[in-house]
Amino acid sequence: LVATYHAAAVPLAQRPVGQVTAAILRQPGPSLESPLGNLIADAQLHATRLPGQGGAQISFMNPRGVRADLVPDEQGLVRYGQLFAVQPFGNHLVVKTFTGAQLRAALEQQFDSGTNTPERPRVLSVSAGFGYSYDLSRPAGARISHMVLHGQPLTDEARVRVAMSNYLAGGGDNFTVFAQVPDMLGGGQDLDALEAYFRASSPVAPPATNRITRITRSAPATGSNQ
């Protein structure tokens, strides 16, 4: 029976879904965002950006939800089984409305909530168009600064629509602020969103890891948010 199901799954796993220009990895960069995490955030935003899909303006992806690198074959092809290896949990996307202050509080939890600490931070990847800076030398609750959306400052009073997985929306990975907002619009499965993004955008290049800036004494700069 197991062999029968395995044989039936092989054609699905081998189905091409798109192309990449280079391997897209989950290894974090200096700011602790990752190219593959950023790609998934972009795919989630693409799937939820229209008004009927939730009207999302920003998307977040938790690093623990990215389970494998995306390495193409010699022709640059990526297959469905590889996408499944990257996102195997079957989460679905949701969109919630947050104030800028709530987003700031949620981002502070990357460094100060449960097992998320300055020594072992859990930095979310973000979709293109959104960016911010953080400084781990500052005290808890004051580490996030310079939040911007499409080049404009994101104030504490602003209201924005944010896409994420139902796991993250429920407070997963110690992001309890996300669970404090009850309104929610349910969407499709995360894996379907990633496949649709590849079909719409191939060939896909590895996203730059310049959406978030980690401020240090030697490099107190803000991100380019591209």
Predicted feature locations:
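Glycine-rich phosphate/diphosphate-binding loops and the adjacent beta-loop-alpha structural elements
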Residues: L12-E33
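Short N-terminal helix-initiation segments at or just after the protein's N-terminus
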Residues: T4, S31-G37
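Active-site-adjacent helix-turn-beta-strand microarchitecture at beta-sheet edges
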Residues: L1-L12, T115-E119, S137
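Feature captures C-terminal
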Residues: N38-Q226
